[in-house]
Amino acid sequence: MTSKNILNKNNCYDAILVGAGIMSGTLALLITEILPTIKILIIEKLNKPGSESTGAFNNAGTGHAANCELNYTPVDENGDLQIDKALFINRSFENSMSLWASLYSKGKIDIKKFLKFIPHISFVTGTENISFLKKRFKAMSKYPEFADMEFSSSFNQIKSWAPLITTCRDPLDKVAATRIKRGTDINFQALTREYLTYISKNKNVEIFYNTELIDLKKTDKKQWKLKVRSLGKIVSLNTSYVFLGAGGKTINFLQKSKIPEAKIYGGFPVSGKWLICEEKSLTEKHNAKVYGKADIGSPPMSVPHLDTRWIEGKKFLLYGPFAGFTTKFLKKGSYLDLFSSIKKSNLFSMLDVGIKNNELINYLFSQSFKSHNSRVENLRNMMPSAEPSNWYLENAGQRVQIIKKTKDGGSLQFGTEIVNSGDGSLSALLGASPGASTAVSIMIEVLKKSCLFNADKFELEKKLSNLLYESEIKNESDNNFLEIIKKRNNSILGFHP
C-alpha cells in the first residue's frame, strides 16, 4: 500500500473520506472510475487500512446475501413471514459481486485475495423452528434470488452438508436445514487493500495513515475545513465534500459537523467476541457457513453462526458472536466515546432507549461475563462435539447501533443508515449489519446524493451501470436481468453450479 508521507497545510481537495475501511474504499473506487479527475484524500487514524470494523476478525464477513441469516426474515404480528429485507440484501450483494467481476475481468483487483465460494446453511432444531424454516424455504425459493435453495429434514443429508453439526448429535433429534451452494466467504479487509492499491495509482488520489480527524466545520465559502493530526502535526484541509466512514466513531464526527440532520442521532455501542478454532482436524471437516436462530431476547447481531473463514491464507472456524457492552465506539477507541456523544439534542432519546431496552442491556452485561466453558456449552447447541481445548476467545469488532429521535422519545435501530447534509456536501454512514456486504449499493446511493454527482447525471448513471454490469447488458428492467447478471458473475468469478 502506498501513500505520501507528508500532509501539507491548507491542501484543497474535491473530496475527503474519513476512515480507510471498506466503505471509504468502495466510495473512492466508484469516484475514481466515473469521475477520474476528482481530487480525493483518504485519512485513516491507524497505520493500515481496514483494521477496525472491516478487519477480518472484527466483522461477520460472511458475504451476507441473506441466504441463511434467519433474522432477515422475521415473522410479523399476524404470523406472516417478511422477506423484503432478505430480497433487498441479496440484490445489493449481487451488485457487489457485479462490481468485483467487472474489476477482476479488467485486471484491476485479484479476487483470489478476498473471495471464496462456500455453501450457506440455515440450521434449526425442534418442531416449531423446523416449521418456521420450511415456511421460509417455501416463501423464498419462489424468487429467482433464492431459487437454488435446498431444504432437508434428513439427518444424513444434513450430515453430508455439514458433518460437525451432526457429530455426537442424536440421529433421532428433530432437525432441518436449508442450503444455498452459491454462498461466499469475503475477507473485506483484503478487499479494501485491493481497492486502495488500485486507486492509489491514480495521481488524484492520496491516502494518509496515522492521520486523525480532530474537527470539521463549514466555512463561508461553502467548503468544509477539517483539522487533522498527522504524524504529530496539526494540519488544516479544505474540501467541497466529506464522507464520514469511520465505523462507530462516525457519530462523534457527525455531531462535530453541526449539520441539522445530525441532531436526531445517538449511538448504542455493542461489543462482540468470537470462539476461534485452528485445529486442522476440525477445520478440514467444515466447509460451510451455518446460521442458527438467535435466543429469545438477544439482539439481531447475536444470531449464532459457525463459519468457515479464510484469513491471510489460513482456514479458521469462528463461532459467535457473543455480545457484550463497552462505552467504546471503536475497538481501539476511548471509553469516553459514548459519553462524548451525549448532547442536549439526543439526551432524551438515549435515556428513553435505555429505559425501553433494559432487558437488552442486562443481556449484554450477562454475555460479557460468561466463562469459557459456558461459551463452549453454547457452541455445543450447534456443534455437540465441541471441546473447550480446541477453541480460544478473541474480541470481535465494535458496533454502534443507531439511536434515533422519534416523536415518542427514541428508537434503537439495527441496520445501516446514510445521513446526508441538505446541500449534499457531507455524508455519513451509521449503524452496522449488513454493512460491508452491501457496501457497493450503499456507496452508490451516497455518491448519487452527494454534490459530486451534480454534473451530467444521465452520463454518470450510465457510467455506473457500465461499471457494474458491462455495456452489453442493456435493460435492467428485463425479467431475466438477474439471471443474466448471476450467470455472468458466476462465469467471471469462478462459481460452477
Swiss-Prot record:
Its EC number is 1.1.5.4. Transmembrane segments: none annotated. Its cofactor is FAD. One of its GO terms (molecular function) is L-malate dehydrogenase (quinone) activity. Keywords: FAD, Flavoprotein, Oxidoreductase, Tricarboxylic acid cycle. Pfam families: Mqo. One of its GO terms (biological process) is tricarboxylic acid cycle. PANTHER family: L-2-HYDROXYGLUTARATE DEHYDROGENASE, MITOCHONDRIAL. HAMAP family: MQO (MF_00212). This is Probable malate:quinone oxidoreductase. The lineage of its organism: Bacteria, Bacillati, Cyanobacteriota, Cyanophyceae, Synechococcales. The gene is mqo.
